[in-house]
From Swiss-Prot:
UniProt name for this protein: Large ribosomal subunit protein uL11m
Gene Ontology CC entries for this record: mitochondrion; ribonucleoprotein complex; ribosome
Gene Ontology biological process terms in this record: translation
Keyword Chaperone: no
Biological source species: Acanthamoeba castellanii (Amoeba)
Length: 339
């Protein structure tokens, strides 16, 4: 069979047709001759190529096939996603009029459609498809054509991958638990996030019942719809609105001078808009009361309008970071006594 690789040129492109071909037809030649014969395509060559590309389908199913035909009587076959009804009909106790399949069968069908739709395997996704093979084998026998090295199939590496995935999920759960607990706060990015400065900042903020912890940049990007957030991102927040208001009031009255410059994200209109506040509250505080919603909205609106041209915390928080050890210890002790 001749394969022409230049189908994207208009001078060779003639026609694109979609044919619904049964996998096992009693007389495939007579079925395809009226269609392909119009363009001078050899039916037997087409069937041979079709059989090779549909070898992984082991039961009767209608396969939508896109055929690209050139002016020099060559063709290219592209398999489309098979009909879901045709695949479901091969499951036990399935009826089109009265469906009787369990949730696991629906899950396996969704995976099957994904494999048909993505007929290529990425190096990063190979481990995922290996783990799904046992589910897919219950519905259809799929030939994945994987060139997996022996090291990838070793049990020790598989266990290591499972541990890494478990660690990643645990870290995400801890992060969201902290965000749900500290419902009022803001995101900041530090140019310099040394351990000593951060530990000191955590200690001083803890006196005011304020928490600070590291967050992922893609979390803030997903909230605001922007993709330019990167760097050392932290969330500063409190469990109570009054603690957060007291925090903003205190830092707005101080004078500063330091080379440790935190940067406030220039979200501007996105941050002060009502949709962002609603999204922020729906993610981190689904049970917030209406009065708290408007209070937090007013805080963000006033805060950004006043400091939108400044680097927040560059002028408002650095006093917590430029004290020497002796002064910091004295301040912490005095604050503890007052409280």
């Amino acid at each position: 069979m001749r394969i022409n690789l230049n189908f994207h040129y208009d001078k060779l492109h003639l026609k694109e047709i979609i044919i619904l071909i049964p996998k096992y037809h009693t007389n495939m030649v007579s079925f395809l001759t009226p269609i392909l014969g119009l363009y001078g395509i050899n039916v037997k060559e087409f069937i041979n190529d079709f059989e090779i590309k549909t070898r992984f389908i082991n039961f009767d199913v209608i396969v939508p096939t896109l055929v690209k035909i050139s002016k020099i009587k060559t063709f290219e076959i592209i398999l489309k996603t098979p009909y879901v009804i045709s695949i479901l009909s091969n499951l036990n106790n399935f009826s089109v009029t009265k469906p009787n399949i369990d949730l696991l069968s629906v899950y396996k069908i969704s995976l099957l459609k994904s494999v048909f739709h993505s007929n290529f395997l990425d190096v990063f996704h190979r481990r995922i498809y290996l783990s799904l093979r046992k589910y897919l084998s219950l519905v259809i026998k799929v030939n994945f054509h994987l060139s997996v090295s022996s090291a990838l199939a070793k049990k020790s590496l598989s266990n290591l991958n499972n541990l890494l995935l478990l660690k990643f999920n645990i870290q995400n759960n801890i992060l969201f638990a902290k965000l749900l607990n500290n419902r009022y706060g803001l995101f900041v990015s530090f140019n310099n996030s040394s351990a000593s400065n951060l530990n000191y900042l955590k200690t001083v903020l803890a006196i005011q019942n304020i928490s600070i912890f590291k967050a992922k940049s893609n979390l803030l990007s997903s909230l605001t719809g922007n993709k330019y957030f990167f760097g050392n991102i932290y969330f500063i927040g409190a469990t109570s609105l009054k603690y957060f208001i007291g925090f903003l009031k205190e830092v707005s009255l101080k004078s500063f001078g330091s080379n440790f410059f935190p940067i406030f994200f220039k979200i501007r209109s996105n941050l002060v808009s009502q949709p962002f506040v609603k999204l922020f509250l729906s993610v981190f505080n689904s049970q917030v009361k209406l009065i708290n919603f408007y209070a937090l909205r007013v805080i963000y609106t006033i805060f950004i309008k006043i400091f939108k041209n400044l680097n927040f915390l560059n002028k408002k928080l650095t006093f917590l970071l430029n004290r020497n050890n002796s002064n910091s210890n004295a301040n912490i002790s005095s604050n503890i006594k007052e409280s």
